[in-house]
Amino acid sequence: MHFNNKNKSLDCLNTKIWPSPAKINLFLSVTGIRKDGYHFIQTLFQFLNYGDYLIFNTTSDKKIKLINKIHGIRNENNLIIRAAKSLKDFMWKNKNHDTPGVKIFIKKYIPIGGGLGGGSSNAATTLIALNEHWKCKLSLNTLADLGLQIGIDIPVFIYGKSAFAEGIGEKLSLFQPKEKFYLIVIPPIKISTKLIFNKFILNKKSYLKSCNQYLKKPLKNDFEPMIRKNFIIIDNLINYLSKFSNFRLTGTGSCIFSEFDSECKAKEILYKLPNKIKGFVSKGTNISYLKEILKIRSNFNVLS
């Protein structure tokens, strides 16, 4: 769902509802592979004005429940549940603070296995929302540390600012790229990040670069050649869409995207997508909608 500035006042007042924004990787370079399988990367994260919504209702039974299951993901493996349990355990072990239970409902719009960070974003929103609802009073740094134990991409969603990421993705430096319009194309397949990491072979000598050095050249994603080779539908889509603009992969896929200076131009190409191929147009944002909502709620004390 698109986050609309016209609805921002309503989103701020209904404190049970929290946005969970998508992200894109404007570029992604693999610079090495650790013995444990983790990949050293350099990438630039930017948020989209589009994403999921999570609804939180605290309960007295101290149980954590996800009301609507996400197809293909067992509840115990869901990052929302893992994030909530992580915060609950941390508060008990480190603060001797017994938190209440919670029922969580998700309105899912970010495609699963699309490289838009839906699971990581959901986990980050859960940590931030429950930090407020349970009155944990933890800092963003502490929440980011908790998130990092669950998923590498979670901290960038906790901080809510576009960033240049290094290491295995955990070293973040603030960076503000231009806020352009993006056409996101959603192929009808899901791609497992773990599967791609296991298959990826680093066959080049990579050098660490600054973010500005990457931005001086055409942007690319090092996972794209392998994914195009293994998923013919993505290769065909990129070939077809290259008639209109330069498209590239975000994350480990499956979604591909292109950037535009105007929303009108992006929508013009959206309407040229092949039948049964979905997509949407969104503005890139350097401050996530979640961070905006949290700031406004805090300023107006609507969370107290």
From Swiss-Prot:
The active site is at K23, D153. Signal peptide: none annotated. GO terms for biological process: isopentenyl diphosphate biosynthetic process, methylerythritol 4-phosphate pathway; terpenoid biosynthetic process. Its EC number is 2.7.1.148. The keyword Cell membrane does not apply. HAMAP family: IspE. Gene3D superfamilies: 3.30.230.10, GHMP kinase, C-terminal domain. It comes from the Bacteria. Transmembrane segments: none annotated. Pathway: Isoprenoid biosynthesis; isopentenyl diphosphate biosynthesis via DXP pathway; isopentenyl diphosphate from 1-deoxy-D-xylulose 5-phosphate: step 3/6. This is 4-diphosphocytidyl-2-C-methyl-D-erythritol kinase. It is an enzyme of class 2 (transferase). Keywords: ATP-binding, Isoprene biosynthesis, Kinase, Nucleotide-binding, Transferase. ATP binds at P111, I112, G113, G114, G115, L116, G117, G118, G119, S120, S121. PANTHER family: 4-DIPHOSPHOCYTIDYL-2-C-METHYL-D-ERYTHRITOL KINASE, CHLOROPLASTIC. Homodimer. It catalyses: 4-CDP-2-C-methyl-D-erythritol + ATP = 4-CDP-2-C-methyl-D-erythritol 2-phosphate + ADP + H(+). The keyword Metal-binding does not apply. Belongs to the GHMP kinase family. IspE subfamily. The gene is ispE. Catalyzes the phosphorylation of the position 2 hydroxy group of 4-diphosphocytidyl-2C-methyl-D-erythritol. GO terms for molecular function: 4-(cytidine 5'-diphospho)-2-C-methyl-D-erythritol kinase activity; ATP binding. It comes from Wigglesworthia glossinidia brevipalpis. Pfam families: GHMP_kinases_C (PF08544), GHMP_kinases_N (PF00288).
